[in-house]
Amino acid sequence: MKILIGLDASTHSERVLDFVARMRWPAGSRVIVLSMLQPVASAVTGAYEPTVIPAENLEGLRAQLEELVADAERALREVGFSTEGRVLAGDPRETLLQVAHSERADLIVVGSHGRSGIAKMMLGSVSSHVVTHAPCSVLVVKQTGRAKEGGKEPRP
């Protein structure tokens, strides 16, 4: 089974990774850990704006995401997965779908950040877009109330 995991720099990504690591998967399952450098979105319209990000900030963000992906790969290898990590530039919604298509993923795993109402409408939802347009099944890992409050979550 080929599993594509979308991670970002949020604490909820830890929940996604932990969920995948604890589940039972077919022998020989391979995980692609993907994180995206994304364009800056306007908080008012949700539209992507051509904002120039200073090179040193972009390099710092890329380094942070590469470390996140490397840590995720290590954690997954410890529990027996074959892994590959990537940091790509682009809109997370479209990048996840493109990689799922090109890699012929069997499953995409993403987190739900719990946005609702106006925030969801303005900012959009990566998980909703991926669920709607994915070429394969999608598992959305919800952040529970205990995790939002900083408590320990039950085992999936």
Range-by-range predicted roles:
Residues 6, 86, 111:
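Active-site-adjacent beta-strand anchor residues
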Residues 98-149, 156:
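Gly/Ser-rich helix-loop-strand patches that form or flank binding pockets
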Residues 1-52, 81:
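Small/aliphatic-rich secondary-structure junction motif
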Residues 15, 95, 117:
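Phosphate- and divalent-cation-binding pockets in alpha/beta enzyme and binding domains
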